């Protein structure tokens, strides 16, 4: 997934979050805060997402909104979440400069 650098309100779907015991049951009632969502920008140290958590969509998939702070670094963006009761979830996105994104 491609994201535009330093741009607010970019929606990303992450998941599925599956039960850590059976590995197949969708976890649909998790409370995911911004500090649960960890980001690594272009290979840098992992930090908490700036603000806003995750909202369940369906089937264990959650929507998160990235803001301009979350997307201020060009390159690979790793999104990682590990909530108690669920297996870890990872997603890779790529942040592009505005001129490249809009081309």
Q: What residue spans do the PLM features occupy?
A:
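Polar, enzyme-active/binding microenvironments
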Residues: 1-103
């Amino acid at each position: 997934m491609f994201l535009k650098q330093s741009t607010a309100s970019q929606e990303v779907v992450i998941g599925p979050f599956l039960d850590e015991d059976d590995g197949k049951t969708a976890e649909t009632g998790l409370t995911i805060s911004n500090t649960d969502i960890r980001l690594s920008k272009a290979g840098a140290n992992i930090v908490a997402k700036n603000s806003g958590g995750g909202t369940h969509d369906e089937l264990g998939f959650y929507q998160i909104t990235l803001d301009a702070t979350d997307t201020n670094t060009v390159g690979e963006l790793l999104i990682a979440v590990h909530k108690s009761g669920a297996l870890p979830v990872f997603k890779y996105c790529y942040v592009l400069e505005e001129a490249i994104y809009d081309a």
